[in-house]
A protein has these predicted regions:
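Beta/alpha (TIM)-barrel catalytic core signal, keyed to glycine-rich beta->alpha loops juxtaposed to Asp/Glu
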Residues: 128-327
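N-terminal binding-site loop/beta-alpha segment at the start of enzyme catalytic domains
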Residues: 1-77, 140
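Short, acidic/polar
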Residues: 30-42, 93-109, 158-162
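Active-site-adjacent beta->alpha loops and helix N-cap segments on the catalytic face
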Residues: 59-61, 125-131
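Active-site mouth loops of central-metabolism enzymes
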Residues: 23-33, 85-96, 125
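Active-site groove signature of glycoside hydrolases
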Residues: 106-127
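Short catalytic-loop micro-motif centered on adjacent basic/acidic residues
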Residues: 48-54, 118-119, 145-150
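A short, structured active-site edge motif that brings together acidic residues
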Residues: 74-87, 174-179
Length: 327
């Protein structure tokens, strides 16, 4: 089995990209609290890519202050997202909103260039050609490198890239859906969240394999389900660890059974549950990058080490309920 792609390059990103992205949507950063030691530890661990968004409260500002103090902008790959709907549900997939978000992000980060820029949501009522043209213009202006969509269906991405090819333009080269061992049984936040996890999304995953499209997988550990703080034995207490959105999307019998199997395999291999669940992601013959948000530097190192844990095809199938017993 292919144990995960090793060529960590994304088209139109000038630097190599770490397979693990540091997710900045964690409480201290959202609240605007300086986290210099944590961010230092992220870089020292080998992670060079930060996953951000304009609507992650004060996280971009915290990262910007830290980068200025450390003078480390050129060492990093910065991903940010734009165009998130308002709290009242107004869609924001328009040139005005996208450019406004970009300028605010650039100011918060203290940079004039975002390596990877994604639309946080899609609006199918907006012709995809308009979006491709806008992102190409921003690329030509030197504002962004690679671009793409978060929570975009593969059909819309395919349509966007067909338009780009027909008009000799740069295509979408990154997609950020939910992907992980836990299947998402319900849209966590509403407003068009897209997952490619679970048996019903096999066709989507087949498209990603065929296209070798880089996947930046969010909620890749089920928003706490595979953190090690939830156990199968005490699954009825999961809500003490997982927030209401995670419970809505991931707390179901089939995912708790996946957790049980992760616990069995983790004990067998002498590693953590989160390492097993993360390692599974990289066995799926997809060009996957996993977003992991944690305030614990040692857990971050564990996550990086997960990539080297041996896992057979049969073990991966067992974890995903595709076979009943371990060989």
């Amino acid at each position: 089995m292919n144990q995960g792609k090793t060529e960590n390059r994304i088209p139109f990103v000038t630097k190599p990209v770490s397979r693990i992205f540091f997710g900045t949507a964690i409480d201290p950063l959202l609240a605007g609290q300086d986290q210099d030691e944590l961010l230092d530890a992220v870089i020292e661990s080998g992670i060079n890519t930060l996953d951000m968004a304009r609507n992650y409260q004060k996280a971009e500002t915290v990262v910007g202050r830290w980068m200025k103090k450390r003078g480390c902008r050129d060492q990093l790959v910065l991903l940010s997202k734009c165009g998130h709907p308002t709290a009242f549900g107004r869609k924001r997939v328009s040139e005005r909103d996208i450019r406004e978000d970009y300028e605010k992000t650039a100011e918060a980060l203290g940079t004039s260039y975002i390596d990877i820029y994604l639309l946080h949501r899609d609006d199918p009522d907006v012709p995809v050609g308009e979006i491709v043209e806008l992102f190409n213009a921003m690329h030509q202006e030197g504002k962004i490198g690679a671009f793409g969509g978060s929570n975009w269906t593969y059909q819309r991405i395919s349509e966007a890239n067909a338009y780009a090819k027909a008009h000799d333009l740069i295509p979408f080269s990154v997609s950020s859906p939910n992907f992980g061992l836990a299947e998402q049984v319900e849209d966590l936040w509403g407003g068009g969240c897209v997952s490619i996890s679970g048996p019903e999304q096999a066709e989507a995953r087949a498209w990603y394999r065929k296209e070798n499209m880089p996947i930046v997988a969010y909620s890749s550990l089920g928003r706490g389900l595979f953190s090690g703080r939830v156990t199968y034995q005490e699954r009825d207490k999961a809500s003490k660890v997982m927030d209401k959105f995670a419970m809505k999307g991931y707390a179901c019998p089939q995912n708790f059974e996946r957790l049980r199997r992760c616990e069995i395999l983790a004990e067998k291999k002498g590693v953590s549950v989160s390492q097993i669940a993360l390692r599974w992601i990289f066995t799926q013959d997809l060009n996957t990058y996993a977003v992991i948000g944690t305030g614990n530097p040692s857990r971050m190192t564990q996550n990086l080490n997960a990539q080297s844990i041996p896992m057979t095809k049969e073990e991966a199938e067992y974890l995903n309920l595709e076979r009943e017993e371990l060989p």
